[in-house]
Regions:
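Flexible glycine/proline-enriched surface loops and loop-helix/loop-strand junctions
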Residues: 40-43, 100-104, 111-116, 175-183
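Beta-lactamase-like hydrolase cores
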Residues: 1-48
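Mid-domain, small-residue-enriched loop/turn segments at the edges of structured enzyme/sensor domains
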Residues: 22-24, 121-198
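Extracytoplasmic/secreted proteins, especially bacterial periplasmic and envelope-associated proteins
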Residues: 9, 56, 60, 100-103, ...
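Conserved catalytic neighborhood of penicillin-recognizing serine enzymes
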Residues: 83-120, 126
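Acidic helix-start/capping segments at beta-turn-to-alpha-helix junctions
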Residues: 73-87, 124, 147-151
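Active-site SXXK
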Residues: 48-72, 76, 195
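Soluble non-cytosolic domains of exported or imported proteins
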Residues: 4, 8, 52, 95, ...
Length: 199
């Protein structure tokens, strides 16, 4: 991979692909052993990070466990009322589930389980995740309550009565969506450069 220059051939090709798809895209790709060899498109722009927030959350959990500040075998019982919407994991179960924190982390990372991630975030605390981001040199990475914070904000920004209604509103091409819905300032967000550094 060659280091890119703004307006270079690779940049133009990727931007053209995004344009053809009718989307705006951001990118930061680098060789692991030679980070200066990279291709970037708006690498410092703040963007929603979706489930990628679970990576620094896992790192914060591991650091706290290693320091003896959290017991990875501590068991939590998650009632049906604790479920966070999502297509995988505990979100699709009907009965109370009891799991250790470390098993919740496995669920969170292996199937991107939103309910498990929310339970781990409550146990770890957002401040611990912020410290990890600072320690890893990720100055533009913010968690803002994880997926629950993002979903709550989506419902509020769309004026919908529920998450399902908010999702329907955002997915409807004939509905004008308030611009705050896509504002990374209030959601788990980062920059392509931070995310590449993290991964």
């Amino acid at each position: 991979m060659n280091g890119s220059r703004r307006g270079g051939g690779v940049d133009r090709t990727i931007r053209s692909l995004f344009d053809d798809a009718g989307v705006r895209g951001w990118l930061h790709v680098a060789e692991l052993d030679r980070p200066s060899a990279h291709v970037v498109l708006d690498p410092d722009e703040q963007v929603p990070m979706g489930s990628v927030y679970k990576v620094p959350l896992m790192t914060a959990f591991c650091r706290l466990a290693e320091a003896g500040r959290i017991d990875p075998s501590h068991r939590l019982t998650l009632e049906t009322a604790d479920r966070v919407p999502g297509p995988t994991g505990l979100s699709i179960l009907r009965d109370p589930v009891t799991m250790s924190l470390r098993d919740l982390v496995v669920q969170m990372m292996s199937v991107s389980d939103n309910t498990a991630a929310h339970a781990v975030l409550r146990a770890v605390g957002p401040e611990a995740v912020d410290r990890v981001c600072a320690d890893l040199g990720l100055p533009h990475t913010r968690i803002h309550g994880g997926v629950v914070g993002t979903f709550d904000r989506l419902v509020a920004d769309t004026g919908a009565g529920s998450l399902d209604a908010a999702m329907d509103r955002v997915a409807d091409n004939d509905t004008v969506v308030p611009p705050d819905v896509y504002d990374p300032a209030y959601k788990a967000s980062s920059t392509p450069a931070d995310i590449a550094r993290l991964l």
